[in-house]
């Protein structure tokens, strides 16, 4: 893989930390995709959804407060329909439910090992 900022152990710890923070704010249909062997973009994609913009904001804010690392980049926070928190090795996608159903991002990575969570 390309310029990794964490070790595999650190990445998996960050994933669990993000999952815990997202579920604290009732993220729905949370999915962790292990894309390490499929792309150089990241080791993991975390995808979750929420029904309202305030809930999306709460999930994103809780992840940002509850993780030891700051995201390298944030995209979509102004509109709160699809927010990307880029932790380099871990990409977090927080969707409004309708947006997630429309884009079906997880279908693009259907062959990735996955783990599902729900609050």
Q: At which residue positions do the language-model features occur?
A:
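Polybasic/polar functional segments that serve as interface/processing modules
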Residues: 1-42, 50-87, 97-101, 108-119
